[in-house]
Amino acid sequence: MSGLPIATNLYFDAHFHRRGVKLLPNEFYTTREDMVLVTVLGSCVAACLHDPIARIGGMNHFMLPDDGADPSAAASESMRYGAYAMEVLINELIKAGGRRERFEAKVFGGAAVLAGMTTINIGDRNADFVRRYLALERIRITAEDLQGVHPRKVAFMPHTGQAMVKKLRVQAPDVAEREAALAREAAGPRGERAARARPRVELFGTPAPKAQATPRIELFGTRATQPATRKQEA
């Protein structure tokens, strides 16, 4: 692929009673419609961005390639590709009327489903990148569910900024096989793409809570909630 493609798998989501889009790895989608964006993550990460004033939002789904370089080095190919994946999402939201200074982020994924395939855990690598990138861009992370050993199913409402997550079985062979193939593909040349780089989380199956000051993470199909992990404000 020569660029980060827009997700095209549109469907009607019977659970949320609205139109939805399923994102595959290395895809993104932005909209101001009252719809749901859904993806399944293993070691990949997804950033969900929302402008609460313009009521527009979007999601991406990506994995950093392992180029053998120091993963924290800004000049490495993997960092350039990660920056590209984030900038595509940010720029599309800005073109649609969003303002960078108003963006809020919710981030997911980075599980250890491909441990041992690279010199460091690829899930940790992805999670560390998305945190650092958003900190450098001064985009506030209002909630996150990163790392661990469980694949995740994530649903995001771009119109409201509401997000929900469901932990999947640790041994989810379809997720592991898909991401193993993605990791092998990511190990190949990413030059063309790299050159172009320059408030609440709930679980599926629960009633939507009223707005609260502290973002919450809730799981699909349960009523249990837990505080979201939040970054310290500067």
Curated annotation (Swiss-Prot):
InterPro entries linked: CheD-like_sf, Chemorcpt_Glu_NH3ase_CheD, Cytotoxic_necrot_fac-like_cat
Record's keyword annotation contains Hydrolase: yes
Annotated EC: 3.5.1.44
Region (Disordered): 183-234
Transmembrane segments: none
CDD domains, per the entry: CheD
Biased composition (Basic and acidic residues): 190-201
Keyword hit for Hydrolase: yes
PANTHER family named in the record: CHEMORECEPTOR GLUTAMINE DEAMIDASE CHED-RELATED
Similarity comment text for this entry: Belongs to the CheD family.
Protein name per UniProt: Probable chemoreceptor glutamine deamidase CheD 1
Organism: Burkholderia thailandensis (strain ATCC 700388 / DSM 13276 / CCUG 48851 / CIP 106301 / E264)
Gene from which the chain derives: cheD1
